[in-house]
């Protein structure tokens, strides 16, 4: 008990954020996340392949604590910023690729759509600061 109190006191005195300890994995400063295809402004017919790019880090499966690695999440028509203290949502607009996929076959209804990648850590939290691609806009015919 004394040891636990000493560790807690030391953490509080040094300003270590205990609640966020397992969150906010740092990415290398030169890491760069991007959408290879489709290009910004593209018009696609029906379902299409979306290809993901990452430089300066590796792609791994969800749950892996491999250093300098994460897995892709594709945000579709999402305008709200992600909360870095919460896991990336998983729903029809926040697609998870936890098996380490670097491409996906996407089927969207006709119209204008935005796509953006976010790299998640082992527990689906965004990196700190968040590693996100440029948001692109496509037209689906």
Label each region the model flagged.
Residues 1-8:
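Bacterial N-terminal signal peptides that target proteins for export
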Residues 23-45:
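Short, compositionally biased P/S/T/A/G/V-rich stretches that sit at domain boundaries
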Residues 46, 70, 109-111:
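A glycine-anchored, Pro-Gly-centered beta-turn/N-cap motif
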Residues 53-64:
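Short amphipathic, basic-aromatic surface patches that mediate peripheral association
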Residues 64-72, 132:
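Short coil-to-beta strand junction motifs in C2/discoidin
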Residues 81-83, 120-128:
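Short acidic/polar inter-strand loop motif in beta-rich domains
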Residues 129-141:
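Short beta-strand elements
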């Amino acid at each position: 008990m004394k040891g636990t109190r000493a560790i807690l006191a030391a953490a509080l005195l040094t300003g270590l954020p205990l609640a966020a300890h397992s969150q906010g994995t740092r990415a290398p400063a030169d890491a760069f996340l991007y959408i290879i295809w489709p290009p910004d402004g593209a018009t696609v017919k029906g379902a299409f392949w979306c290809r993901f790019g990452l430089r300066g880090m590796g792609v791994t499966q969800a749950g892996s604590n491999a250093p300098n690695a994460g897995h892709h999440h594709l945000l579709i028509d999402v305008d709200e910023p992600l909360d870095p203290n919460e896991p990336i949502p998983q729903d029809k607009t926040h697609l998870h690729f936890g098996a380490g996929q670097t491409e996906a076959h996407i089927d969207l209804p006709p119209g204008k759509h935005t796509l953006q990648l976010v790299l998640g850590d082992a527990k689906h939290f965004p990196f700190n600061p968040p590693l996100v691609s440029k948001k692109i806009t496509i037209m689906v015919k």
